[in-house]
Amino acid sequence: MLDDLLHVANAIWVGAGTPVAERCIALAKAGEWEQLARLRVVPGDYKLWHDYKVDAQCVDLLRKCEDLPTGIDLEGVAKTAFLQSESLCCHTNAYFSRFINMGPFGPGDARRLEFISKVREEVQRIVGLPPKRLDFRLGKGGTLSDPGMNSTVPHKFCSEPTITPSALHVLPQWAQTAWARNLEPDVLIQLIDYDRWDSVAKDALKNRGISIQPSINIAAQLAVGKFLRRRLKAQGIDLDTRQEMHRFLARIASVDGSLATVDLSNASDTVAKRVVQILFSLEWFQLLNSLRVPTTKFDKKKETGRLYLEKFSGMGNGYTFELETIIFLAISRAVCGLEDVSVYGDDIIVPTEHVGSVLLALRFFGFSPSPAKTFVDGNFRESCGGDYFSGHAVRSHYQENDCTSPQDWISMANGLRRVWLVDGTDMLDSVVTKAWHLCLEKIPVEIRACRGPEILGDIVIHDAPWNWLSRRKDSIRYFRAWLPYTFEVVEWARFPAGAVLAAALYGVSSNQDNSFRLFGIRTSEGRPSKA
């Protein structure tokens, strides 16, 4: 396990030839995987961008590899972080209760109330009035009604819907949807008062906690999230394009230092109930609160062990991302004014001159800025997956899994090339040249011939144009590609007629053989397409 991947990793470490790289080699040789995953470099310790990029790649390469045998209970770490966030939210709720109940007050509370009022006014300016009608939407993931593979649109349209008692007021609107109208007569709505906690892979040291919601709740939450997204766009914050803008701003700030990039630890899990209550109008709070789920359950096999939540919402709730964006935007604007503030989730960019006050304000509302991912001075900035040192992109390639198939090796080779191309050329940096060729050596010769541009993704090996294998016909260029996926299809006949009609009205496309594509499965029987 991992032998071939470690062979490639070792080539990168040897190619780097720095003390940090030597430390990585020593830890890997000793099997100290947890120490290897915890190894970090600090941008402030470097004067030259390339020196930092080399060492960062050395320590980052396997940091997110879920197959790294660290021996850590990844789900246990995620659960501990969840409970710690709940404890923090409990303290935040207790602190803000006196502002909601209007006393008892202490010294300095008049100024705090004034600032809370300023943030609240900014929130109200952003969100306006609540929507009168909800445009129910389905998410891509599972719900309490639709676990695992049974989470496609038609599956959701014929399962037993679930809803919390507090959300029953949306049923008259939901009843007008094709989903509700076409349910089978014997399908009943199930009342439920909890969500289910689960975790998904994040890196080699921990998982990320998520919550699985009741099906009608999540559909209504997504409707509210869509409405809030439109309100943010009206304020100049287009969440559909904001990541690219943040990366641009981070690059500029790494050169002139005019902006600071702020990142929060466990942001969505630390939005406390009382913070939302005090910052949003009564009408908005009642709507948001009615659609959230008040308790969570850790063990899906047991009815006991539920936890009454101190946080307002977390990952899995359909409006959490928009909600936290609005809160952080309002706090930042209350400090800095309307200009030069940009927020995308918990990625915050503010003028450097105001960042100290913004950090104090965030802490006041119970949030925890991450010291390791907040950059105020120096030549480094990070935001929305973009790392920049003096204007140069220095983001590492993260190998998230072991390489066990040609597709894995193509993906790793492409990842290294994407990060390590010398600016303005088709040449690889010498640090990873050997590692890139080792990746290609792991790929069968017939598949190795599939070369093409980056825009095609990992169905080709990204390479210089003169190495592409392609042909032109009728002004269309065809590339030889590796297609290792087959797509399982499901016959529409498996579903009740009402669910099929509702899915068609929702926009699910159908194949010519009266089936629809379910999901892709990587197979070892894939073969290169003809150019």
Language-model segments: which ranges?
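C-terminal, non-catalytic extensions of nucleic-acid polymerases
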Residues: 1-207, 357, 421-531
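Core nucleotidyl-transferase/polymerase catalytic module
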Residues: 1-7, 178-345, 349-531
